[in-house]
């Protein structure tokens, strides 16, 4: 079972929150105290909450659920793409476009345009265009790939969101709430935990901490997938008998 230990969290600096003056009082239950005007997160709370979230993510992916990883700030962007891709899931790692979930119909049209442009760039269509037109389409393709590349093969709304920074990604969380999509999120001491179904109190800035969360979530997803495959294999074996 995918889990994270207290030791892993301490080594990655998960317990370091933000400066005390930036705190959100709603995070008080998860704060151990303060050191040098920086809040210290209570890992006695974080460890079981993180492991409960991982168990639920395993369950969702064992039912073929789609997990959308969201981390658009610089510290998280590259890692979010790497780990989401590594477990065959989906991601938004640049700007969250308003309506990405709540206006899926429009987003789907943009994804279709992205895929059309990808085909045109490969089948020689671009070569037949004027230099100016080809350049315009190349730029449009790059822009669409940047914003929608991570969800172009999602084929519909996700079954869960895994978010790195609840404060930074509040629009994504609000959209998921409106649609009843469960939200799993790292929530630092400066963030509002409201709207997050599975709160993981922790540092959302340190790259080591971010990679620790992503490694664990990717492992949980892969574990869920392998359970699903094992069930499928068992069912086909029974049918064969």
UniProtKB/Swiss-Prot annotation:
One Gene Ontology MF term: structural constituent of ribosome
The keyword Ribosomal protein appears for this protein: yes
Protein family per UniProt: Belongs to the universal ribosomal protein uS2 family.
Gene (UniProt): rpsB
GO biological process terms on file: translation
Cross-referenced InterPro entries: Ribosomal_uS2 (IPR001865), Ribosomal_uS2_bac/mit/plastid (IPR005706), Ribosomal_uS2_CS (IPR018130), Ribosomal_uS2_flav_dom_sf (IPR023591)
SUPFAM superfamilies for the chain: Ribosomal protein S2
GO cellular component assignments: cytosolic small ribosomal subunit
Protein's recorded name: Small ribosomal subunit protein uS2
């Amino acid at each position: 079972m995918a889990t994270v230990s207290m030791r892993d969290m301490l080594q990655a600096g998960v317990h370091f929150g933000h400066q005390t003056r930036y705190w959100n009082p709603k995070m008080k239950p998860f704060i151990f105290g303060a050191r040098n005007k920086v809040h210290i997160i209570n890992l006695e709370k974080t460890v079981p909450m993180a492991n409960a979230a991982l168990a639920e993510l395993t369950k969702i992916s064992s039912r073929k659920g789609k997990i959308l990883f969201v981390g658009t700030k610089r510290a998280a962007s590259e890692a979010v793409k790497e780990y989401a891709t590594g477990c065959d899931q989906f991601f938004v790692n640049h700007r969250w476009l308003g309506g990405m979930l709540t206006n899926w119909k429009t987003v789907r049209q943009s994804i279709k345009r992205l895929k059309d442009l990808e085909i045109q760039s490969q089948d020689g269509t671009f070569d037949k265009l004027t230099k100016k037109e080809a350049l315009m389409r190349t730029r449009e393709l790059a822009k669409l790939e940047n914003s929608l590349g991570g969800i172009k093969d999602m084929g519909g709304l996700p079954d869960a969101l895994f978010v790195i920074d609840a404060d930074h990604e509040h629009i994504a969380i609000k959209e998921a709430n409106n649609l009843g999509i469960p939200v799993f999120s790292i929530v630092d001491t400066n963030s509002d935990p409201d709207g997050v179904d599975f709160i993981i109190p922790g540092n959302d800035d340190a790259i080591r901490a971010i990679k620790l969360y992503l490694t664990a979530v990717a492992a949980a997803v892969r574990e869920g997938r392998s359970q699903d495959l094992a069930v499928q294999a068992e069912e086909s074996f029974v049918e064969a008998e």
